[in-house]
Amino acid sequence: MCGLEQVKPAAPRHQELTNGQLQLPGSVVRLHQACNSNSPYTFVRILASQLGSVLDAPRHALLQLRLGILFSLATHGPRLPLLVIGTDLVLAHRLLRSALQLCPNPTVYSHLIPLSAVLARDTSGAHCLQAGQLQRAEDGVLYLGQLAALKSSVKQQVLSVVETGATTFPALPRCPPTQQPLAAALWATAEGSSTVIQKNIKDIESFCNVFGLVVHSEVDDETVMQHCLFSSYDDLHDSPKVSFEDLARLIDQVRYRKVTLTESCRSLLTGYFLASRRSRGSGSEVPQTALATLLRMAEAHARLALRQEAVEEDGVAACHFYETSLAAQVGYSHLEPPAFSFSSLGDIVGDVAKEDMEMFHRYCSVMIIMLSKHTPSSEVLNIT
């Protein structure tokens, strides 16, 4: 037959055989039970803090990036690509490289290998398809690194692949070109001031629009200094609540789990999407694809929280992530999302963080109600 046959990965086959029942590591079960009576965001936040080691980055720092990594890893089918922007991405880069090991087929981009499949000849001279890096990273992650270091042709190819959600295989002598869904998540970084990034990456706005998860990563100097001082200690011990192996097992099981969205969750996401577009004039800062991204983020948050149904709080987590990224990108927010800046791991799940998320939920609901009165019904029908 022409083209390549899509083989179902082992994890979804396991889901079918076990009827969706999870076989969770003991550390995950104990942590989930301990968090069950707390905030609906606590368990996922603690999981995010467990990414990497304390040598990569302080566990209380870069929470927005940590959540973005988890959201990307906890999706299947149309994957959530991740773009990290900042003036100093040393700690972010360490965290990304460490998180790569949580997925199958982790791949770091090399300019020596084609991005997608190319036509080649085998030793006998017969035509064949040579897998590119997107195919080799199937079911995993392709870490592109610095966008500024990529050739213009590769950047355009990346934009096309992410926007269409598919990779194209070249035509064989007797077979037409074929397409397959993109099965790898793409991670990339853009480092420098906004002026430098605009100069080095002419189409950075296009990348921000098509990459579902955009994180503006900034770490204050005091956090970096403390990290450098403490990480140099020879006797530094790291005792994560969930080991690296257990976290990998959890992600591998939950990302193929089917999640249904409750009406309240879908209504919140749709209302937030419409309100965000209307409150920003032309709406160009919030692309049409944003709603699909919000839905997938809510589903990913529900999976990570071990729920098979995405509830309203999962939608709030998705809206908060998106609004935080949008505020950093355009310089303002109508909702004033609480900043992810913590001085300790306890702050991530403390009462203040819980109250901040509850306040954001209320602000979000009020904005949706206010702007929904001025939203034409035709606009709602077009996206539902």
Predicted regions and their residues:
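Active-site-adjacent bridging/hinge elements
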Residues: 38-47, 264-275
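Short amphipathic alpha-helical segments embedded in low-complexity Lys/Glu-rich regions
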Residues: 15, 67-70, 80-86, 113-116, ...
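Conserved ASCE/P-loop NTPase catalytic core
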Residues: 32, 36-39, 44-255, 369-383
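Extended, charged/polar low-complexity intrinsically disordered regions
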Residues: 1-51
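C-terminal engagement/docking regions of AAA+ P-loop ATPases
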Residues: 94, 269, 278-290, 303-384
